[in-house]
Amino acid sequence: MCSRGDANAAGAAAARRVTGLCYNMGLLIALALLCLFSLAEANSKAITTSLTTKWFSAPLLLEASEFLAEDSQEKFWSFVEASQNIGSSDQHDTDRSYYDAILEAAFRFLSPLQQNLLKFCLSLRSYSASIQAFQQIAVDEPPPEGCKSFLSVHGKQTCDLGTLESLLLTAPDRPKPLLFKGDHRYPSSNPESPVVIFYSEIGHEEFSNIHHQLISKSNEGKINYVFRHYISNPRKEPVHLSGYGVELAIKSTEYKAKDDTQVKGTEVNTTVIGENDPIDEVQGFLFGKLRELYPSLEGQLKEFRKHLVESTNEMAPLKVWQLQDLSFQTAARILAAPVELALVVMKDISQNFPTKARAITKTAVSAQLRAEVEENQKYFKGTIGLQPGDSALFINGLHIDLDTQDIFSLFDTLRNEARVMEGLHRLGIEGLSLHNILKLNIQPSETDYAVDIRSPAISWVNNLEVDSRYNSWPSSLQELLRPTFPGVIRQIRKNLHNMVFIVDPVHETTAELVSIAEMFLSNHIPLRIGFIFVVNDSEDVDGMQDAGVAVLRAYNYVGQEVDGYHAFQTLTQIYNKVRTGEKVKVEHVVSVLEKKYPYVEVNSILGIDSAYDQNRKEARGYYEQTGVGPLPVVLFNGMPFEKEQLDPDELETITMHKILETTTFFQRAVYLGELSHDQDVVEYIMNQPNVVPRINSRILTAKREYLDLTASNNFYVDDFARFSALDSRGKTAAIANSMNYLTKKGMSSKEIYDDSFIRPVTFWIVGDFDSPSGRQLLYDAIKHQKTSNNVRISMINNPSREISDSSTPVSRAIWAALQTQTSNSAKNFITKMVKEETAEALAAGVDIGEFSVGGMDVSLFKEVFESSRMDFILSHALYCRDVLKLKKGQRVVISNGRIIGPLEDSELFNQDDFHLLENIILKTSGQKIKSHIQQLRVEEDVASDLVMKVDALLSAQPKGEARIEYQFFEDKHSAIKLKPKEGETYYDVVAVVDPVTREAQRLAPLLLVLAQLINMSLRVFMNCQSKLSDMPLKSFYRYVLEPEISFTADNSFAKGPIAKFLDMPQSPLFTLNLNTPESWMVESVRTPYDLDNIYLEEVDSIVAAEYELEYLLLEGHCYDITTGQPPRGLQFTLGTSANPTTVDTIVMANLGYFQLKANPGAWILRLRKGRSDDIYRIYSHDGTDSPPDANDVVVILNNFKSKIIKVKVQKKADMANEDLLSDGTNENESGFWDSFKWGFSGQKTEEVKQDKDDIINIFSVASGHLYERFLRIMMLSVLKNTKTPVKFWFLKNYLSPTFKEFIPYMAKKYNFQYELVQYKWPRWLHQQTEKQRIIWGYKILFLDVLFPLVVDKFLFVDADQIVRTDLKELRDFNLDGAPYGYTPFCDSRREMDGYRFWKSGYWASHLAGRKYHISALYVVDLKKFRKIAAGDRLRGQYQGLSQDPNSLSNLDQDLPNNMIHQVPIKSLPQEWLWCETWCDDASKKRAKTIDLCNNPMTKEPKLEAAVRIVPEWQDYDQEIKQLQTLFQEEKELGTLHEEETQEGSQKHEEL
């Protein structure tokens, strides 16, 4: 017989990496197996984790349709047609055939890369939230009884098509429904017609019938057809989620915290653990390979593997010298593996590090590896700011933040990148050129454009360089470089800061603006101030009748007779006479003039024949020419301020800010020698690149729409039948194919070849050239093009009348000229054609030949002009309607694919606008793309086309962070490198990682999935740390993510992805944590085991932990627009139209942050009724889904990504001096908190009408079965000793399913109320990673937002405490104005002095004689706590201290003690908390509560201590156990009352 030692020896001898299997392999295995058969059989233990949604799963067909809709609505509708009847169950005998049918239908519209992304997306179930959102919106309608599908017409529902007509007749009387971004709108020919929303399930016959009838009604222009998914009878199974991590951390067993209660295991479906699990290498044996080679030895191989696993999983601690090089040794081990397995090895080592570490300590590290890593680290630090040990991931140069980015946002990045890369690929750009072009930064710069202020139209009030009042100021620009205190405004005799007020004198805001200008002047602010008065500019206007003209002439009179400064004083005097809110009148002007200049005839100044009329016409001309937008306008160095910045208080602040900001700009210019002393400063400012002749908001707006120009085909507009059959992208390609361009110098490849004539700017002018406005637009474009060699122009006709020969002469003449003439002749001829006199002559019957120009082939021109083919105009008109979505005759300018318009009928778009447009394109994208295209060496016309198409593609990308340029040094010895497949587009993926960090645990599995999904060039650089002094990873980890849906052997869908921890060591104590995306709130729902204390030696086979996604968070930031500060204590509610207040929250002062718990659907955000709604109103909102002017703020949650909104609020006019928190107690109106407090036995507290002062609120936290057992005993001790009614508040985040199920039953038996509260740790607050420290954080960091405002005071009682007195006494204890009271640590047990850390060092000096308090029991006055912003102060201090891992070792206790000077603590009398560790035995008899503190000297387990120290503890324990037995019996008999178990499925709880 072999001993276990022999077997180990055999295993060790076999432990060599087996890659090539040598001939005696069979012999080796036979020997090893022979030994192993005698070993005792022991079952392998495992832990599994799954996560599902609360809502039911929708058919995958619907999710696939949403994937396509994200690409385009056109693809969505095509897919809907292609997938008819897929949903009918009789079509498919298995899940796999159903899945394959979906893919087959979808693949028609997708490239190979997108096909993979679709499979991944279906595996992630990322669109299940979108379908559920539609489902919730449908339920809100609500659906008519017994209908599988239904229609909603302006709020009226029906499922009978017959009644549709009558509903349509009355529809205009009802308001149109609010449509959302995710709605599927069928292309409509008449946007004004009624909206019909069809709720149905695609893929079914019933859907198809109604759908086709609605399409024909839409095509006839009778309806606007909108489709929303709706499943009348969903399958009753949840969605299995992935994209999260599961951590199994090893717990310290210094203090035993395990419950000794026996747990019955549940039946677990063991098939969850597959035979061919990928973790397949044990001690060098590749078992997957061995099973393939020796199928007959399956059983023996299984035994052999198990033995090897058990021998490896011993976890003896390592010596400090063994730890030092673990990071480098792990890197060496990974890099030694064959390149295709390196990621597998990295995943295996990082995710199972505690059991792998010992073997790794034997790995040798080569000098080259070490040197290369250290060399690269200098570079990482210098260019991307990474320290040794840090991690980073870049995809095509985009930084993917592993801490904040979840898999769903990463998926979006992959998809966006695929669009661009495939677009470039379709345009024939490949390989390295593709990546170089992709990395061009062509995002529109955030430049503030400025207009030229060197205009005679401006009347300057002062001039800093000339006026005597500034004589004492220094005039040298070198003064700018002299150091001053921060924020000091330098007074220099130069016109560095110029402010121009463009005003209409009779506008009511003008008086305020004049007084601000006056304030700047009188305070000697270094500003040159000027005015432009925009008034009536008709020839003969009488200033005695027109107040605006009167102000202008009076100003000019004084300016001319005296000077600008006195003219301005006169202006202020005029406006001083005007009462607030009134307008200036002629008599105001007359009275000031008569008083100041009594000797002058006022009529001669103001009247029709006034000699003081300068600038009147120029002023309006300047205003219209610069296009600066509606009056009033204030320019700072030519840059217009935003409208909201013109508020008087705001304007003052923002101007000071601008002065300081531009000072920095000038300092730099002087320092670099760009601005010298003798230069004219204003000239210098006006020569900056951001100065343009005209500001056109249409051109400068951030919202931009682009054509997709990436398709290619061989169709043209002169074949209308073919053209009309193309899809949008195909039509655009045909339009581009058919274009002939006008260019300067008439150079095109037909005549002369010169590669410098790639023209980076292409304008397509869209309009009706047989109408004056269309001709004018084209004329201005041609005029501009004559001045620029960068531009080419072509036309698209959008006729406003029925198409016929007589209605289109100019359009046909332009087309014929472009088809038949040289570029130069065509240009000259077309310029003639768009003049008004030509159109008039043609209309009068003059022959078109009369207008021919020199060098023109007239007969060829006439032949084309007179042919009867109108295809090109028909195609153009169809294109305008279907793709550009224009009405007949509307004008648009398309510049490099960007659609500007439609322009209003009277809107000016002139030569200056074309100039501005060209400037912007050249600066942001045109030149950069042109220089890359030049390197491709394609001919000129093709090159200009390419610039246009590439620009449209790149510019259409959502604005994100700039791509990072990285040129890493060495990758010979320290990087994993995977090459992409040749000839296909590939992603450039770079990762930097230390293989023994938490980031590596997530990154390795992620990269493995990406490798199966996408073609990529991958480089993973090792970023190791040296000289480790601690074990770098103390946890096992699994990342749940699969590239495609998996199936069982019988072709059914597998039960969804799960995390599997197989072959785990049995001796350690584990705690299980989920690592989910930031906006998910998950809870443990089904497991009898204690997930906080998993001890595998006591488990039968499998610990199966089931979690549920309880809520998706809606997060936001809120500011008061008046103060710019967060409105602390403001409350929001979130609900639906049927149930307006489902949840409620409070705004924090930190960043104005708030969070609300929701689920997929459409939600309405409101201010909470009561003080919030009385004092404030919502002013504006951003990131929401309703139009800015809508009454309700609607927010749609329809995906798994974070949703963060911004809300600005404003105090109501009569509430300006009210304070939200001054009287928070009045919030007890029948608002939300009352509407669903779950009282005992699940009742709402309204029925238990209790005066709130007569209730004691007790808060506690617990995690793990032992502490929940203590918690129940603590509650019992409170109830036995307290006569006043009690309400318990528990932190829900970490409670076990067992506790949540039992608590309603206990509440009913002992007649108390309880509530579960929860809050998600905000993403911006420094995160803790250890579960115990997270729970400590919840004890102190969120007290102001965890409870409703109606709770004034609460007591915190630790779970392991026993109460021996009535807690009413503590509740009523006078805190002397402090926000909270804590008990100080006892000093009486002298033998513990060595452990009292607060008596020396940092704590002794910080406390300065004050006591150090224990956090096991405290009382909080929430009104005071909120009033002094204690929560915000505590979070602020925590944020600073927690960055240092060595501070706040007892977070919940150290933080309030550290803040004792800012947030005072009232010390409670010592008897309120007795604990044996610190207090002597004599004081025990006075104890009001006993706490089972840990004893650092004896390390006695909690349970033993409880029994020994507290005599009544065992009685309480027995009493609860009997109640639990009773509960179990009733549960098994099914006699539990419904409401007693309701908590488990409760729909909403408060924060």
From Swiss-Prot:
Residues recorded with modification Phosphoserine: S1277
Outcome recorded upon mutating N1457A: Less than 15% activity retained
Localization terms from the record: Endoplasmic reticulum lumen; Endoplasmic reticulum-Golgi intermediate compartment
Region Glucosyltransferase: start-end pairs: 1244-1551
Reactions mediated catalytically: N(4)-(alpha-D-Man-(1->2)-alpha-D-Man-(1->2)-alpha-D-Man-(1->3)-[alpha-D-Man-(1->2)-alpha-D-Man-(1->3)-[alpha-D-Man-(1->2)-alpha-D-Man-(1->6)]-alpha-D-Man-(1->6)]-beta-D-Man-(1->4)-beta-D-GlcNAc-(1->4)-beta-D-GlcNAc)-L-asparaginyl-[protein] (N-glucan mannose isomer 9A1,2,3B1,2,3) + UDP-alpha-D-glucose = N(4)-(alpha-D-Glc-(1->3)-alpha-D-Man-(1->2)-alpha-D-Man-(1->2)-alpha-D-Man-(1->3)-[alpha-D-Man-(1->2)-alpha-D-Man-(1->3)-[alpha-D-Man-(1->2)-alpha-D-Man-(1->6)]-alpha-D-Man-(1->6)]-beta-D-Man-(1->4)-beta-D-GlcNAc-(1->4)-beta-D-GlcNAc)-L-asparaginyl-[protein] + UDP + H(+)
Free-text note regarding domains: N-terminal non-catalytic domain is assumed to mediate recognition of proteins with partial folding defects.
Protein name: UDP-glucose:glycoprotein glucosyltransferase 1
Gene source species: Rattus norvegicus (Rat)
